[in-house]
């Protein structure tokens, strides 16, 4: 499974399997990733892409050329693993990207579940973005408050020796940030 978040010119993907989670990596808008992106932009809810035989081999050869993912796949082979002879990718779309479910057999009974997971993930990711925005606003408010304390000290300066007090306030405010 993976989730893929759209960026301006490429996307960021987080992938996990029975072997664990890989670090996030960038996916270019090329080949299969372009097809996934375009389907999402057209408003698809679920795209199913089947790879068998030579097409599956070519798919994994391409994935091996990508930074991070390629390294992990090559390590899997070096550790005695192998690529599947066939797989079915299910891209379930949400506002910010898609969830990718990979199966080895058709699973039409799971299609509605994949779509439901995408909707819940959209809610979760929206909450994540809201929290990021709130944290940034809080940080900006802290910076503004610190600047105001330094300004207040500067405005209270009556003689040149008071510059030392301002420098102390500045130091303390920077430490707090």
Segments and roles (model prediction):
Residues 56-98, 106:
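Helix-to-coil/beta transition segments that act as allosteric "coupling" elements at the rims
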Residues 105-126:
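Amphipathic alpha-helical "output/dimerization" segments
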Residues 2-59:
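GAF sensory/regulatory domain recognition
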Residues 1, 5, 154-162, 167-177:
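Short regulatory alpha-helical segment in sensory/regulatory domains of signaling proteins that mediates
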């Amino acid at each position: 499974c993976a989730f893929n978040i759209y960026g301006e010119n490429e996307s960021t993907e987080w992938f996990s399997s029975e072997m664990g989670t890989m670090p996030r990596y960038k996916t270019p808008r090329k080949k299969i990733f372009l097809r996934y992106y375009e389907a999402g932009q057209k408003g698809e809810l679920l795209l199913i892409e089947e790879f068998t035989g030579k097409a599956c081999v070519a798919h994994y050869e391409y994935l091996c050329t990508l930074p991070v993912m390629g390294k992990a796949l090559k390590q899997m082979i070096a550790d005695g693993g192998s690529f599947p002879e066939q797989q079915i990718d299910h891209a379930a779309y949400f506002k910010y990207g898609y969830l990718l479910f990979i199966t080895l057999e058709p699973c039409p009974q799971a299609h509605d579940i994949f779509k439901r997971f995408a909707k819940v993930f959209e809610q979760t990711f929206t909450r994540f973005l809201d929290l990021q925005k709130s944290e940034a606003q809080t940080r900006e408010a802290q910076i503004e408050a610190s600047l105001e304390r330094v300004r207040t000290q500067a405005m209270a300066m009556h003689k040149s020796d008071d510059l030392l007090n301002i420098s102390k306030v500045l130091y303390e405010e920077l430490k707090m940030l």
